[in-house]
Amino acid sequence: MSFGVPHSGGSRRSKWDQAGPDADAGSAPTGALDAAAAVAAKINAMLVAKGKLKPSQISSAAPVDKAAGAGGNKLKDDLVVAEVEINDVPLTCRNLLTRGQTQDEISRVSGAAVSTRGRFMTVEEKSKALPSDRPLYLHVQGQTRDLVDKAVNRIKEIITNGVVKAATNSTYSGATVTVYQQSGPSVPTIPSAPHKPHYPGGMHYVQDKVFVGLDQALQGFNVKERVEGPSCSFLQHIQAETGAKVFLRGKGSGCLEPASGREAFEPMYIYISHPKPEGLASAKTLCENLLQTVHAEYSRYLNQMSSMMPTQGFIHPPVVNGLPPQPPYYSPAGFQPSYPAPVPPPPPPIAPQYPVAPVAPAPVPPPNAQYPITPVPAHVPTQTLLPAAFPPTAPVPPKLTAPPNPPQKRRFTEEVDEMDRGLLGYQHGPIHMTNLGAGMPVGSSETSGPPSAASSVPVRERDSSRQLMPPPCAPALLKPLRPLKADESPSAPSLLEPQVKRMRTGLVAYAGDSSDEEEDHGPSRAAVTAAGNPGAGWNPYRCPPSPPHRPKTQTAPQPTQQNMPFWMAP
């Protein structure tokens, strides 16, 4: 009966009676989770490739509870989602936000995924659009609210910069940034940073300008530093209090415009931008208070500079005002007394003139005594002696005055006297045609003898003396010998005629000398011998000095010729 034991101990086994439902029950769910995990990993890899997720997010989402398969759905519901509308922002800003590179940069900075949703619509299209058709917006998704806040703040900053650029280049009313929240039980709202207000739906950015008004300030007063404060602490305080964007722009602000690459042409001003008009007004009030304080500081600065400078007219030069040492500025007071100092120099030249005036009268008497002395010898002998010699008959004064004049024997008074007759004293033709060898006619007016010597002798006697008398013994005397002859003493009636001629000529008569004789010794000698030579000792060697008797006057060949100037002679 052993046969029945095994039969009783076990029944016939079939494929349906295989034991393993317990093991299969435990292994079946495991295979489904693995498959789900593989699909999730593939999806995560795709998101990472697109930049939508980060590896850290995948690792945090990998562990899944095996107890319930609803854990993944719960994790998905915990994601925070925000939507920022960019349909109405400026075109440049909208193009920048829709670029994949910009969205990747926002994802790296904030840790939240950013993607573009919807499409661009105009105002008319918005009014006619269906509820399912939404305008252009950015979809931001993150695991925590902080990550989403970072992404939204970054997007808002980009939009603000775009609004500012549009405001500087053209008038722009403002951009509408709408933040959408995904309704969920776990995340009712998306709070922002504690110091910034919440993002209400449909807010508009408004802006304003507050001009500083210190464009003409001195260089020593740094307006930019006074407005911004140490490390821009003043403007940062206004931003923290009002949530507005406040920064300095314009000339001297150091803010370069993106379009031109240089500062704006407008005067320095504070640019204010805020989503709400109330916040803009409060920020503007704070900026005005700040500028009032800066103006008060500048007034004190000017007062200080004016107190340092004695002359307020020189307040403007910044270099002088900026010098730290004050004593040099008090020194100009010392220069002021020096200004009268240049005035005395003009009087000193006048002072020397006064001493010069008294000195001049003192020496004046001696010059007065000398003045008559100097002109008298110059004029008296020439003017007084000549007329004085005319009235008296004494021949001595004229003879004494003649010796100083004889040195001018080369002046040839015959020429001057003969100019009245129109004849020259030189030979102008053959000797036989001149008067060198013949005596003068008795009654001719052309005879001109030496005024000093021939004045006392008649014309006939003078001519005969010239032809018959031998020459003087001393040839050196020349002219003085003939005037001193005793037989030629002048007579009163004959004296006046030569004196008148001397008065007219003002020169001493020329009686000739040995040099003149040598020029024409042949003809003169023949003439003398023809007239007769009484001296037996009249030797040929005496002939050269003898011709002094010949006057250097040229007589016309015909005594009846009419007198006329030589330049009018035919």
UniProtKB/Swiss-Prot annotation:
Comp. bias (Pro residues): 391-407
InterPro entries linked: KH_1_KHDC4/BBP-like, KH_dom_type_1_sf, KHDC4_KH-I_first, KHDC4_KH-I_second, PRP5/DDX46/KHDC4_KH, RIK/BLOM7
Cellular component terms per the entry's GO annotation: cytoplasm; nucleus
Lineage top rank: taxon: Eukaryota
Bias type Low complexity, positions: 553-562
SUPFAM superfamilies: Eukaryotic type KH-domain (KH-domain type I) (SSF54791)
Protein name in the entry: KH homology domain-containing protein 4
Organism listed in the record: Danio rerio (Zebrafish)
Lineage: Eukaryota, Metazoa, Chordata, Craniata, Vertebrata
Gene that encodes it: khdc4
